[in-house]
């Protein structure tokens, strides 16, 4: 029959990892001050009175630049283990990595052509 004997540690870890955030939220709710003043709802700006509103619209160029950064950051995450194990992987892994890099170069050229890297 099926035995759960080997999963005792995992079950304990699961229960503790679920109980700690719940306990933190309940403790915060019980110990936090209950008053809502107008000053408490103000935006905090480095200890000074806020200047202007906190809700401003960012230019889309910042989002495009961040998206390109994330794409090439993920590229680094994939290529680093490949570079570490390069000698053990063989020719097929080398060709696959070249195809992966070629696809990313095409993506960079596309982003460059569309102006995602321009700040002017």
From Swiss-Prot:
Primary site of residence: membrane
Keyword terms, alphabetized: Membrane, NAD, NADP, Plastoquinone, Quinone, Thylakoid, Translocase, Transmembrane, Transmembrane helix, Transport
TM regions (residue ranges): 6-26, 64-84, 89-109
Membrane association type: Multi-pass membrane protein
Any one GO biological process: photosynthesis, light reaction
Alphabetized Pfam families for the sequence: Oxidored_q4 (PF00507)
Cellular-component GO terms for this entry: NADH dehydrogenase complex; plasma membrane-derived thylakoid membrane
InterPro entries documented for this protein: NAD(P)H_OxRDtase_bac/plastid, NADH_UbQ/plastoQ_OxRdtase_su3, NDAH_ubi_oxred_su3_sf
Gene Ontology MF annotations: NADH dehydrogenase (ubiquinone) activity; quinone binding
Location in the cell: Cellular thylakoid membrane
Reaction(s) the record says it catalyses: a plastoquinone + NADH + (n+1) H(+)(in) = a plastoquinol + NAD(+) + n H(+)(out); a plastoquinone + NADPH + (n+1) H(+)(in) = a plastoquinol + NADP(+) + n H(+)(out)
Enzyme Commission designation: 7.1.1.-
Subunit structure: NDH-1 can be composed of about 15 different subunits; different subcomplexes with different compositions have been identified which probably have different functions.
Family statement drawn from the similarity comment of this UniProt entry: Belongs to the complex I subunit 3 family.
Chain's role: NDH-1 shuttles electrons from an unknown electron donor, via FMN and iron-sulfur (Fe-S) centers, to quinones in the respiratory and/or the photosynthetic chain. The immediate electron acceptor for the enzyme in this species is believed to be plastoquinone. Couples the redox reaction to proton translocation, and thus conserves the redox energy in a proton gradient. Cyanobacterial NDH-1 also plays a role in inorganic carbon-concentration.
Name this polypeptide is given: NAD(P)H-quinone oxidoreductase subunit 3
Species annotation: Prochlorococcus marinus (strain MIT 9211)
